[in-house]
Swiss-Prot record:
Annotated segments matching region Disordered: 1-83, 102-129
Main location: cytoplasm
Binding positions for Zn(2+) per the UniProt entry: C226, C229, C248, C251
Protein function: Component of the coat protein complex II (COPII) which promotes the formation of transport vesicles from the endoplasmic reticulum (ER). The coat has two main functions, the physical deformation of the endoplasmic reticulum membrane into vesicles and the selection of cargo molecules.
Any coiled-coil regions, as ranges: none
Keyword Protein transport attached: yes
Subunit structure: The COPII coat is composed of at least 5 proteins: the SEC23/24 complex, the SEC13/31 complex, and the protein SAR1. Golgi apparatus membrane; Peripheral membrane protein; Cytoplasmic side.
Statement: the UniProt record of this protein carries the keyword Protein transport: yes
Biased composition, class Polar residues, residue ranges: 33-45, 53-74, 106-129
Any one GO CC term of the record: COPII vesicle coat
A single BP term in Gene Ontology: COPII-coated vesicle cargo loading
Name of the featured protein: Protein transport protein SEC24-2
Gene, per the UniProt record: SEC242
Superkingdom field: Eukaryota
């Protein structure tokens, strides 16, 4: 007997909710009546085409507890990899696959290595655990199995003897650090033979707020480091018990422990965090960092454009309103955070904010400075004020600023002088400068001119003429900012040309970020909501001030370069005046000498100041096995990390060379890997025709490269340079999880979601429907689909959707009543299906406290034979449909070949 309380799977045409004949929430002017959201159909201006794709939470080995012995995360990952590979081989009708016990990999000297199927098999060193290589013909797996994008990387196989206290905590979490290669060639020749890149993907902080999942922290002020290489004590050092010393795993130097401390006497020594956790924090003594005598407070300086453009598009009001609502969210743990406001048009406007009193708000004094040639502060008092002591008066001032400038006719914006004066104001303290603008800087130092894109876009000159830095000020000023410990963030909202390519240099080289809102209108509720939520999330994010990043590696390895929004002081030292929580970095490695040991190591250390003024150290240590066998290198390669590395290098190629160089790099890199795999690994058997064979753990790499080539950052076509520039900006800063989402959007079929989808599980987490392939061929004309991109959510309503579906979702009777463009789903309490869809959308927008992005929802109705011929929406909806299907990246869209065509052409090139 069925349980009546269990929700039924949605099967149409049976309706769950019947709209009244006169809908209680009718659409008026394209918007839901009674809601603040306004619909904006994208007709004359295309929506912002942000990067796309998704990387969901990785699967866990659910039956780990049933294993006969303890399984580390690496063992669980290995079990998962084997299960996936076995499934792939079953699909390929391979036979005689041995039964595998993952625990056998961790039994010393068992010699139990799995025989690869169908490839060359060299003799392996007995006793050394290895990932085994499983072949797959990519052409037989079409459409691609996109769930493979959710898999963890091949496990890092470590023997217990490697660690002083072996446990699962010695494995570096891929949330913080992961390598493109989880088995490192022992020689540079072997690395070159593989054609695989060797790099680390670093995300120093997992969440926007440090209170979420903090790392273990040592608070006893002991920071133990190697006296030769300065590496930090970690789980992989060798403890010399007789001498109470330790051998550094990076350089081999023997070091002592502090004398007279019981913390470093046996058995207490083995309980220390340094020997237990590969990722951890330290609170050093005040004398540890001698460069900083007294940590200054956190400082936030806002430079706000008050020219006529910000009045017309409602951005000034939006900024003031969002800042008022965020005053209590700005980190102010020690009540020392300082705030300053500078407004700019053709002059600079300073505000002296008085202290709060019990008598109510007091008026602030405004000082107007028209001399833009030299930095000049009108007064030394009350320009930089305490957030705690002036909070009410700051709110009062912010609410008045739109009124003060509402009648302006000034079209100028002196950004350069405003930045110079802001740096002068905070030169002794550093901090963040946040610029909010709708106008191209057109006055004073840093003046920019519109660039003529006609005849240049989509040519060999595009990168040099449209995406280069137009004025040297935007590079030279960042050098000064790094000296003064100032980070610059940009929030740009405009329908006009803004030269994002030039302005983004300010954030790129100071550790900040550029946020762009094209076609912004504050009167459109979706635009207002998106900016307000992202601005508030950005301001509430914890920060690490005065940060330096120092990567280290074993003897024989070399740090080549670092990529991301950072300032490179040297190849192995990067600085960030204020390190955010929502970016990642790539550190490229090389092999300069033969690696003779069984393992090599990398360590990334961050020295920074917290928001409370304390110095802190975060250390991430990664141990990797070495190998002399090319099979092991391929079998242990991380396809998602490789794709992230490719994206960073391709971005560099665009900026330093051209788009053709970037596209050639992506294509050639993939081809060389496949050629060498075929040459060195594959046993050719062409009886059944030419195949495109690859290792199972790398089979999604061609898809990812193809998606990068189709991304707005790299694809061919005439693309507005500001959209191109912001896409490149995101490519060089997005964390791996969101960069994969950038390349391959997640698509959900909603009209047939499982019973549990949209409802909380036993832990209160909303269950998501299974993803489907990004292809229009999977879309039913009567269906309902959600396309999840990094910046937007697109709800695709099939043009032949039946009335029951339309009623359940929108409370309407006819699919042609559904609005198109920016909107929100109405809340229909009587429709359980509507509530489940709203929960799915809210869950996606939460971003797991990892990104500030709030995705705008677009509703797009598919075409139908019953569509009214003379509908006024027809001309407006066609470009919206074309934009939506451009995210279905497996198809032949935006003038690019489909994934199937890409593979066929790739095979043809490889066989020449």
């Amino acid at each position: 007997m069925s349980n009546p309380s269990r929700p039924k799977k949605r099967v149409y045409p049976t309706a769950q909710y019947v709209a009244p004949s006169s809908p209680s929430m009718p659409f008026q002017g394209g918007a839901f009546s009674g809601q603040t959201m306004q619909s904006q159909v994208s007709g004359s201006a295309s929506p912002y085409m942000a990067p796309s794709g998704q990387f969901t939470q990785p699967m866990n080995a659910s039956d780990a507890q049933n294993q006969p012995q303890f399984m580390t995360p690496a063992q669980q990952q290995l079990k998962q990899q084997i299960s996936q590979a076995t499934t792939s081989m079953n699909d390929m009708h391979l036979h005689n696959v041995p039964v595998i016990d993952p625990n056998a990999y961790y039994q010393p000297n068992n010699g139990n290595n799995i025989q690869p199927t169908g490839e060359n098999k060299p003799s392996l060193t007995p006793g050394r655990p290895t990932n085994n290589l499983y072949p797959v013909d990519i052409l037989t797996e079409l459409p691609p199995k996109i769930n493979d994008l959710n898999l963890l990387p091949p496990p890092i196989l470590l023997e217990p003897e490697i660690s002083t206290k072996f446990s699962e905590s010695v494995y570096a979490s891929p949330d913080y650090i992961r390598s493109t290669l989880n088995a490192v060639p022992q020689s540079n020749a072997l690395l070159k033979k593989s054609k695989l890149p060797f790099a680390l993907i670093i995300k120093p902080f997992k969440h926007l707020h440090d209170m979420n999942a903090p790392l273990p922290c040592n608070e006893d002020e002991f920071v133990i480091r190697c006296r030769r290489c300065r590496g930090y004590l970690n789980p992989f050092v060798k403890i010399l018990q007789v001498e109470s010393k330790w051998r550094c795993n990076f350089c081999g130097c023997i070091n002592g422990f502090p004398d007279g401390s019981e913390h470093f006497q046996l058995p207490n020594l083995y309980n220390r965090n340094e020997l237990t956790y590969s990722s951890m924090d330290f609170l050093p003594s005040s004398s540890y960092s001698q460069q900083v005598k007294e940590e200054p407070p956190a400082v936030y300086t806002f430079v706000i454009d008050v020219s006529i453009n910000t009045i017309k598009n409602g951005y000034l009001f939006s900024v003031a309103n969002a800042l008022v609502n965020s005053l209590d969210l700005i980190p102010n743990h020690d009540n020392k955070t300082l705030i300053s406001l500078i407004c700019a048009d053709s002059s600079l406007h300073y505000f002296s904010v008085p202290l709060d009193t019990e008598d109510g708000p007091k008026e602030s004094s405004m000082f107007d400075i028209s001399d833009l040639d030299e930095p000049f502060l009108p007064t030394s008092n009350s320009l930089l004020v305490s957030l705690s002591q002036c909070r009410n008066n700051l709110e009062h001032l912010l609410l008045k600023i739109p009124e003060i400038f509402k009648s302006t006719t000034i079209q100028s914006f002196a950004l350069g002088p405003a930045l110079q004066n802001a740096s002068e104001l905070v030169k002794d303290k550093g901090g963040k400068v946040i610029v909010c603008s709708s106008t191209l800087p057109n006055m004073g130092i840093g003046k920019l001119n519109p660039r003529d894109e006609r005849g240049i876009s989509n040519t060999s000159k595009e990168s040099k003429d449209l995406l280069s830095c137009q004025d040297a000020f935007y590079r030279s000023f960042t050098v000064e900012c790094n000296k003064l410990q100032i980070t610059i963030d940009l929030f740009i909202a405009s329908g006009n040309y803004m030269d994002i390519a030039t302005l983004s240099n300010l954030s790129k080289y100071t550790g900040g970020q550029t946020h762009f809102y094209p076609q912004f209108l504050g009167s459109v509720a979706a635009d207002f909501t998106k900016f307000s939520k992202e601005f508030s999330r950005h301001l509430s994010m914890d920060l690490s001030f005065r940060t330096v990043m120092r990567p280290r590696c074993s003897i024989g390895l070399r740090i080549e370069d670092s990529y991301g929004h950072l300032f490179n002081r040297s190849t192995d030292l990067c600085s960030f005046p204020a390190m955010p929580r929502d970016q990642s970095y790539v550190v490229e490695l090389s092999i300069e000498d033969k690696l003779t040991a069984d393992y090599c190591y990398a360590q990334i250390a961050f020295l920074y100041s917290t928001g409370t003024g304390k110095r802190k150290i975060r250390v991430l240590t990664l141990a990797l096995p070495t190998t002399t066998i090319l099979h092991n290198v391929f079998a242990s390669a991380d396809q998602l990390a490789i794709a992230t590395y490719f994206a960073r290098i391709a971005t560099e190629k665009v900026m330093k060379n051209s788009f053709d160089h970037a596209r050639s790099f992506l294509n050639t890199s993939l081809e060389e890997i496949l050629i060498n795999y075929r040459k060195e690994i594959v046993v050719e058997n062409n009886a059944g025709g030419v195949t495109l064979r690859f290792s199972t753990n790398l089979k999604m790499l061609p898809l990812l490269v193809h998606m990068l080539l189709k991304n707005i950052a790299f694809r061919k076509g005439v693309i507005p340079s500001d959209l191109r520039a912001i896409a490149l900006n995101n490519m060089e800063s997005l964390p791996l999880k969101y960069l994969i989402k950038n390349a391959y959007p997640t698509v959900y079929s909603l009209h047939d979601i499982p019973d549990e989808a949209g409802l909380p599980d036993e832990n209160g987490v909303i269950v998501m429907p299974p993803p489907m392939n990004d292809t229009i061929s999977s879309f039913e004309k009567y269906g309902l689909y959600l396309i999840n991109t990094p910046n937007e959510l697109i709800l695709w309503v099939g043009g032949n959707a039946i009335p029951e579906l339309v009623s359940d979702v929108f409370g309407l009777q006819d699919v042609f009543q559904v609005p198109n463009g920016k909107n929100e789903l109405p809340e229909l309490p009587e429709s359980e299906f509507n509530q489940r869809l709203r929960s799915i959308i809210e869950n996606i927008r939460a971003n797991d406290d990892e990104q500030i992005t709030y995705q705008t929802l677009y509703i797009v109705r598919g075409n139908s034979q019953n569509e009214p011929a003379n509908s006024s929406q027809n001309k407006e909806i066609v470009p919206l449909r074309n934009w939506a299907v451009s995210f279905l990246v497996e198809d032949n869209v935006v003038g690019c070949e489909s994934y199937r065509e890409f593979l066929q052409n790739l095979k043809t090139r490889l066989n020449k």
